[in-house]
Regions:
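C-terminal segment of N-terminal export signals and the immediately downstream linker at the start
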Residues: 23-24, 61-62, 81-139, 342-344, ...
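Extended, non-catalytic scaffold segments that flank or surround catalytic motifs
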Residues: 10, 47, 61-63, 94-113, ...
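Cysteine-centered iron-sulfur cluster-binding motifs in ferredoxin-type domains/subunits
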Residues: 142-158, 162, 202-225, 236-255, ...
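Long, compositionally biased charged/polar accessory segments in the mid-to-C-terminal portions
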Residues: 296-354
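Short Gly/Ser/Thr- and charged-rich N-terminal loops/segments
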Residues: 22-23, 35-42
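N-terminal secretory signal peptides and thylakoid transit peptides that target proteins
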Residues: 52-75
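Non-heme iron-sulfur electron-transfer modules
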Residues: 125, 162-200, 228-241, 256-286, ...
């Protein structure tokens, strides 16, 4: 059996007082003088037996006491506003939120209510958050007639307004490239062309956005499964689950994904109040976003905002599984193609010339 370990602590013994001697040489035992100090003795005392009088311990210096007091006031000033703020409560609710695919109807109801409160607090606008489900027996597909596109960018402006995209910093789901005749390589396109005098001679224009690929590389690289493809062909993002690693942005060959570096800046009067959780709701800072075929509209039987804004009728949208749809007829009669076909992403966004 091992011997128990006893720790010892070094203590200084108080000075031994000497009796005070009177003028007649007699000693007064009741009065003591500490004018002289003999050599102090040291003793070893176990910690368990240490009963040093706390009154004899040196007090905290005034400077140290003042410093600790100031730091305490400063800490309280920082913590109390956070403790009492509504924003802190909302952030904790968001932190413990489940993935969209794991939420129950009750969970979704609470989450949507939280987002509505956040939007009201941040932008001063009442909004409604909906959750349109993917349609069964539908494969949404986009076709674009490059012979008609004139590069006016009306589609871009309509998309920005409909989908609550940030004005500063500017985010646009659609980019229109001015291309020289004889090439279909987007790398040779000019994104920053002058839009007031279009179309230019010997130029044509290619709008590029999310292709809603059937083999999406962006989905494969997401480490937290915050993006996935739904039954009707739309690739969606759970903005509250996204960690902003930007792997999907690097994997997308069409440069269709955008990162929110700052809190979106949207004028209050320009906010679209009809929002969808996986669609056009205002995205928070630090997450990815992209085109989603206006799922809050298309799943309700409407057309995408960019299509309605196109002045030349170059855009066509519909269900490829419906043999009588406009899209199906284009597939039957036109020579269609996709961008970067060699990558085998299997896009659902097609182009053609007349």
């Amino acid at each position: 059996m091992e011997r128990p370990q006893i720790q010892f602590k070094l203590h200084r013994m108080p000075p031994r007082p000497f009796p005070k001697v009177s003028q007649d040489g007699s000693k007064k035992s009741s009065e003591f003088s500490s004018s002289r100090h003999p050599k102090r003795r040291r003793t070893l005392v176990p910690d368990s037996l240490d009963q040093t009088n706390k009154k004899n311990k040196p007090e905290c210096s005034p400077k140290r006491r003042k410093f600790l007091k100031q730091m305490g006031i400063l800490g309280a000033g920082v913590v109390l506003p956070l403790k009492n703020s509504k924003a802190s409560t909302l952030s904790w609710e968001k932190f413990f939120q489940k993935h969209y695919q794991e939420m129950t109807p009750e969970d979704k109801k609470r989450v949507f209510a939280r987002i509505q409160r956040e939007t009201k607090a941040d932008y001063g606008r009442d909004v409604t958050i909906s959750d349109p489900q993917a349609l069964k027996g539908v494969k949404f597909t986009f076709c674009l007639n490059l012979s008609k596109c004139n590069g006016s960018r009306y589609c871009v402006a309509a998309c920005v307004k409909e989908n609550n995209q940030s004005r500063n910093p500017q985010i646009q789901f659609i980019k229109v490239l001015e291309m020289p005749h004889g090439t279909l390589n987007p790398e040779k396109g000019n994104l920053y062309y002058e839009g007031k005098s279009v179309p230019q001679k010997n130029k044509f224009y290619i709008p590029v956005q999310c292709n809603q690929c059937d083999n999406p590389p962006c989905v494969k690289v997401c480490p937290v499964k915050a993006t996935w493809k739904q039954e009707d062909g739309i690739v969606v993002i759970d903005y509250d689950w996204c960690i902003g690693c930007r792997y999907c942005q690097a994997a997308c060959p069409y440069e269709a994904r955008h990162f929110n570096f700052k809190t979106p800046s949207i004028p209050r009067d320009e906010i679209n109040p009809k929002q969808a959780y996986l669609g056009n709701r205002i995205r928070p800072k630090g997450v990815m976003e992209k085109c989603h075929f206006c799922l809050h509209r298309t799943r309700a039987g409407k057309l995408p905002a960019c299509l309605e804004a196109c002045p030349t009728g170059a855009r066509k949208f519909g269900n490829i599984l419906d043999e009588n749809s406009v899209i199906s007829k284009i597939f039957q009669r036109k020579r269609i193609f996709v961008l970067k076909e060699e990558l085998n992403t299997i896009p659902r966004f097609f182009y053609y010339f007349e």
